[in-house]
Amino acid sequence: MAVPKKRTSMSKKHIRRNYWKRKGYKAAVKAFSLGKSVSTGHSKSFFVQQTTTKTNK
């Protein structure tokens, strides 16, 4: 027969939520940093062909 489990304490709940949020924040910072390095051309892990626009007069 199913028995209800004990309630999780608030401190444990906050720890788990903060850890989950921190993981997302770190992933966002890493993605932003990679995007910034790719856009400036300083990336060492991605090879992006830079396109230059020339104006003809």
UniProtKB/Swiss-Prot annotation:
Q: Which UniProt keywords apply?
A: Chloroplast, Plastid, Ribonucleoprotein, Ribosomal protein
Pfam families given for it? Ribosomal_L32p
Q: Which GO terms describe its biological process?
A: translation
Which coarse location class applies to the principal site listed for this UniProt protein? plastid
**Per the record's keyword annotation, is Zinc-finger included, yes or no?**
no
Write one Gene Ontology MF term. structural constituent of ribosome
Similarity comment: family membership: Belongs to the bacterial ribosomal protein bL32 family.
* Protein name as annotated: Large ribosomal subunit protein bL32c
Please name the taxonomic classification of the source: Eukaryota, Viridiplantae, Streptophyta, Embryophyta, Tracheophyta
